[in-house]
Amino acid sequence: AIKPIQALALIETGAANGFHLASAQIALACASHNGAITHVELVANWLARLGLSADDLVCGPSLPWTTEAQEALFKAGGAASRLHDNCSGKHAGFLTIAKHLGHPVQGYNRMDHPVQQRVIGILEQMTGMDLHDAPKGMDGCGIPVIGVPLGNLALAMARLGDPHDQPEERQKACARIRRAMAAEPYLIAGKGRFCTRVIEALGEAALVKTGAEGVYCATLTGLGLGIAIKIDDGAQRAAEAVMIRLLDRLGALTESAKGRLLNLLEPPIFSRSNEVVGVIRCTHPELALPG
């Protein structure tokens, strides 16, 4: 969920300009993508530009996110690869920073690697926290993860959308991240995904980003607000139900967007006969739909 914050290092170090990255690569650095053909080819070409390959990624081999993409892969005689991992764009971003600054590529995912230390420094500034004693570990794709309270995470997302209290270079970097995410919603996630659909409908006004274990974040650029959600049992569908209702409650959903996102406000539950047998509904009194 914090990939857009981590990707600030790609801009601020000059690595993005040094390797002539476009909005597509910036968006992929922020993405939890489906591993569809478009995602895989773009990341592969990006790595080739660095003189690297999928073998240089520390994220493990994965299958594409969707059944449709998995079937297409198998029919083509393909197999799971590191390029299909939903975090491969983030890893390509870290490798780009390492190459640009002349740091070793090997071990780019280690907590003590200069790339990760730079990323942690940015995270400290954006969250307003000293993270030295914060809980630390490794996430599923092999990158350091740090425990941050939801309030500080929401502050970081608010600053991504409105970085007026940050240095000028940070403000420019935040703007570039926002533009890339808004310009390439498909690359952020993929066909039918919540993140992609919301960004397609609202653009830079509401940039949402999924995370693991029921974490979801958003920046509401025009409102200067950040959102950070954590569902206790890690359920993503619950996080999405809360996020869409928060966007509506905070006035971020235009009438046009509501029309496009109607089946996200109360997602239908289908039987195996494809009949609607229920809906996913947020029941919190301040977020529940009327009726």
Task: Identify the function of each model-found stretch.
Residues A1-A16:
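Active-site SXXK
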Residues I5, T38, N86, K90, ...:
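Conserved active-site and cofactor/substrate-binding residues in soluble primary-metabolism enzymes
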Residues N17, G102-R110, D133, L160-Q171:
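Inter-helical turn/loop segments and adjacent helix faces that build the functional surface
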Residues A134-L155, R159-E169:
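Internal, well-folded beta-alpha domain core
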Residues A158-G291:
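Structured C-terminal helix/loop/strand segments within mature extracytoplasmic catalytic/sensor domains
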Residues H20-C30, L57-G60, P135-D139, E169-A183:
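Beta-strand segments within the central parallel beta-sheet cores of soluble alpha/beta enzyme folds
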Residues K3-A7, L153, G224:
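Residue-level preference for non-acidic, small/hydrophobic
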Residues L21-D133:
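Active-site-adjacent helix/loop patches that line small-molecule binding or acyl-intermediate pockets
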